[in-house]
Amino acid sequence: MIRLLPWLNVVTLGGRSIIDQGLGAVGPVVGELREALAEHRMLILTGPGIRARHILGVGLDLGLPTGVLAGLTSVEAEQNGHLIAALLAAEGVSYLPHTAVGHQLAVHLAASRAVVSHGYPPYGLYEFPPEVGKIPPHRTDTGAFLLADAYGAARTIYVKDVDGVFTSDPVAADGSRAELIPRVGATELLAMNLDTLPVDALLLALMSRAKHVTEIQIVNGRTPGNITKALQGEHVGTIIHVD
């Protein structure tokens, strides 16, 4: 199998965990990405955040099907993508729709060190129906992974507001008992059946079928330097690997 863009770094910014937190979270993250442009070429992807939950709530009340819900929530992720691209515009970074990311990413990255898009997969109306209910099963985390694997990216990094995967919820009442899991296999992690995960469980299931990406990294974007370290290949946060 040929890696189309073996130098590519896919960096996914959590919608709720980073972008929804406002300037205090977004500003330092964007600043760190800006500094990294000199050494790394990146595809920066965004999630929809809390607004997606509002849309899903209204859409479910209206009886909308899964495919329509997927399209509506992806619009919110796109809005966040435009925001991040605007903050990096001075460096020549722009927002690309999925059609351009799918067919013209290489030429855009030849002109600029990074581009921004949203992480929702382009299934839209053709989204797979879930086993239960109507909520789209493929969301930002899985969409970003599918893009990274399709291009054979060097690194796939998820920027959240937690230090990685914990044995229990670190912000719960008994969060002091939570222990960070520095490295774990995807299948092993699924088998743990943890109450909370910083990424979609479906992403872990997809990893076993990946062609190129054999591990992903979850880092805390609220800690200065974590994104830079991950881009440089250092072990920060949690690394989930194919097992």
Give the positions of each predicted feature.
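C-terminal catalytic "cap/lid" subdomain
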Residues: 1-243
